[in-house]
Each structure stands twice: as C-alpha cells, then as structure tokens.
C-alpha cells in the first residue's frame, strides 16, 4: 500500500512559461522541447543544479514554440536565468529562450502565452516572410532566418495630431 505524504510535506511547485526563438525556423514537438530544456539547464546549472530545481516539462505548444516548465518553489529564479542564458544549441543553432513569466498554477502560467505575437507566413519565390501582428518581419531562406525588420504604418493625414 502506498503511503501519501501530508500536504505540508509535499514539495511546492512553480510554473515557468517560456518561448523559444531559434535561427532555424521549425516547430518543436514535445520531445524536442524537452530535449532543448534539458540541454539548456544542464549546460548552465550542471547536473546537481538541474536536479535541485526538479524540472518537468508540463506542456508544449508546437504552434507557438512555447512551453510550461514545472520547477520547485524557491528555485524559479535559477530556472529563469538558466533558460535565458542558453544561446547555442547543437540542433537549432543560435537560440534565445524568452521567459514570459512564472506562476503558482498551470492556468496562471497559460495566461502568459497571450504575450506571444501572432504571426503568418507568406512565400515569395524562394524566400519566406514571417509577418507578426506587431509589425515585425522575418526573412527566411532554407529554413534559417537571414534578416528581420520592423515597420510602422504611417497614420493618415486626418488622424495625425
């Protein structure tokens, strides 16, 4: 028979929401996201530091390249720092993991996903353009981002103050 610990003795958890930006534009499935998080934590914190924070990938959002990572309470700042410091991945090339926020519940962590800008893809010839709702554009060739820019739509004359 399995003995349950009282709620006072069980570990407390925090949930870190993050988004992966990489040089190679590809959607990461759950396994790829898990491998990336493990490589990031091990490269920055080492095996003992990674074990201390007790990471567990709870959710992966393939369409957003985002995820929710469960860590021990009190260790969330170490996890945030380790994810943010990871810069080069053997499979994805240059990578940036943007930490969107931390929460005490999964539902609260999912609210941070609304901060990710929506995007659409357009193909012109051999180039692909990734258009974001906030006015940014990425130029993609052969699966790699080769240029990025942002633009502002000028206001019509009657709307200028």
Curated annotation (Swiss-Prot):
GO terms for cellular component: cytoplasm; ribonuclease P complex. Pfam families: RNase_P_Rpp14. Signal peptide: none annotated. It comes from the Archaea. One of its GO terms (molecular function) is ribonuclease P activity. Consists of a catalytic RNA component and at least 4-5 protein subunits. Part of ribonuclease P, a protein complex that generates mature tRNA molecules by cleaving their 5'-ends. This is Ribonuclease P protein component 2.
């Amino acid at each position: 028979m399995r003995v349950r610990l009282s709620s006072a003795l069980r570990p407390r958890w925090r949930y870190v929401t993050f988004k992966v930006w990489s040089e190679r534009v590809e959607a990461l499935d759950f396994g790829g996201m898990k491998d990336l998080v493990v490589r990031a934590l091990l490269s920055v914190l080492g095996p003992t530091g990674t074990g201390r924070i007790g990471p567990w990938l709870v959710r992966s959002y393939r369409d957003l390249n985002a995820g929710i990572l469960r860590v021990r309470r009190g260790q969330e700042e170490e996890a945030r720092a380790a994810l943010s410091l990871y810069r080069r991945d053997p499979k994805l090339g240059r990578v940036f993991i943007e930490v969107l926020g931390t929460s005490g519940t999964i539902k609260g962590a999912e609210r941070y996903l609304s901060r990710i800008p929506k995007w659409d893809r357009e193909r012109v010839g051999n180039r692909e353009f990734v258009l974001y709702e906030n006015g940014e554009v990425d130029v993609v060739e052969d699966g790699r981002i080769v240029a990025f820019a942002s633009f502002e739509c000028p206001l019509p004359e009657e709307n200028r103050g």
